[in-house]
């Protein structure tokens, strides 16, 4: 009987266990699959290298504090641990202290030389100073291309313990770069870390030295920090095994014996060719995950020249590592954690057809001219593909009156005309502000079509070049071609046609650009009621008045000057002939020494008068943005859209602006810190007033006198022209002085010289 009861009990227990197991399996099957193909399925970590070191001195209080304020809640603070003479740990980016501190000014005679990994190195080493010695030493920028304005602040060196207690980070990462060096000088990094772990919560420890991990193995217990092996350049030698990092990479199972993760440069995963374009990704992430290793990536910063494939957009770079359809790394080490945070939380796993969270017009400037030569077929097609709402055409006229799209009336700004036989068409036209140029009205349309387009490089002097492989790609577009392309697009809401120099062309060249535009609109099937909205833009009120008289197209008045205010009477004048206004970025957020000083009320006043406001010019290059936008075009767009409330952006990089519309973070009830618009003047409060020169004169106020213009003059009779290919008299403005004779002599000389060289 007792055995029967026991059997029944066992059977009952078995049934219960089966039911519990089935319930667990059912629950697991219903659990949603993580969108993150990381090792754990958790979102990648944002690791702030030295805090917000892209702006503030690395490892300073301000850098760490700002990183916490602007990043995801679980952001990791990174500390490069160095040991002082008295074996205390400080957060400092390098062994030597000259580049990132005021050590040389405080102790000018205490420079020494030591071998570091076998290389003789001179400098002010942390091992020669006690913590007390360093109390008067301040942290400064370590990268000279970054702002020096924060160097004048009091930025004392922080210890590992002070970062932990003052910052209270969600996660704390200690990087040990030179354990072997400290050991040579009788300082034990492992002993310091073990002692520190009793009062400091350490979540990650990394090092590029294999022997270091052998020293600390088992010293932190089962719940100790994650250990991460840091890879340096593949051809560099790991100092304790005398093997290259590339050879260690081929044996990840070996790495797994002492570490739970690896930290690698970006190039280990997405290598670049010699022209800085992406090559196919490696299998490192998948291989490491198979070996049970997390993969963290270093080298992210907004103010460096990244792969051309990203179009100077740091968000695109982050997404290529975490949201590419193949893999995701487990964390990114960044100098600008705000961008890493927004990339992961706001823009990851967002398709191109995702719901728009905000509505504004994305208007191009010469198409996607940041990626291809402006006003070419390729620039316009990419703009449409990238999600532009409105594509634009800056209309120019050839000598035979054909309207076409080009950024400037000066062919030399957008083509390689100066390298062709047409260089003898150069003229000087004071009315157009030139000392000598080859103008569109100096060549026929047939001649212009033979020219090679040239991409714009506004930051050439700093060696920031746009898409060099495609710098001369595409073909120039007539206005007719442009309108036909737009009409056949299902995604565009409109076109913007810019008209300038109309008075000069009528008076001096006998060309009527207003008539040419209106005729082409009619010929290409556009009418006043067409589904594709037509906007006519000009800086001249007289041009827009003329268009208003002859059509019902929407007119847009462009204010070229940077202004601090606009009179109500001027707005009333504008409303008589314009339906919208374009203003410059600095007319919204004035800037001094690359810092935003305030916000004007120009946008608010125009919108109160029912005039939509479009703002130009948005570019992705970090040099185009004040420091308040953290070298991130998305932060800039966010500040103008949600902060200033503008109605549209005029941009050379429409993809970045169009992607912003689908920003998931904009759909949330509360504004998250990494999607908060810049507060005008806030960053300036962190800068010492002595760091600035005397204030410059403020921008002017826009008045009625700036709006009022006489009517457009009538078209004058055009002088007879010479045959194509010869020095053309029609290229010479009556008030200009030609340079044809000199150009012709130079051309002949060049041909004679070339003939002699061929002999």
From Swiss-Prot:
Does Transcription regulation appear among the keywords? no
Q: Which GO terms describe its molecular function?
A: glycerophosphodiester phosphodiesterase activity
Q: Where is the GP-PDE domain?
A: 44-344, 360-661
- EC class of this enzyme? hydrolase
For membrane topology, the record states: Single-pass type I membrane protein
Q: Where is this region: Disordered?
A: 702-734
Record-stated family: Belongs to the glycerophosphoryl diester phosphodiesterase family.
Protein name in the entry: Glycerophosphodiester phosphodiesterase GDPDL3
Question: Which gene carries the instructions for this protein?
Answer: GDPDL3
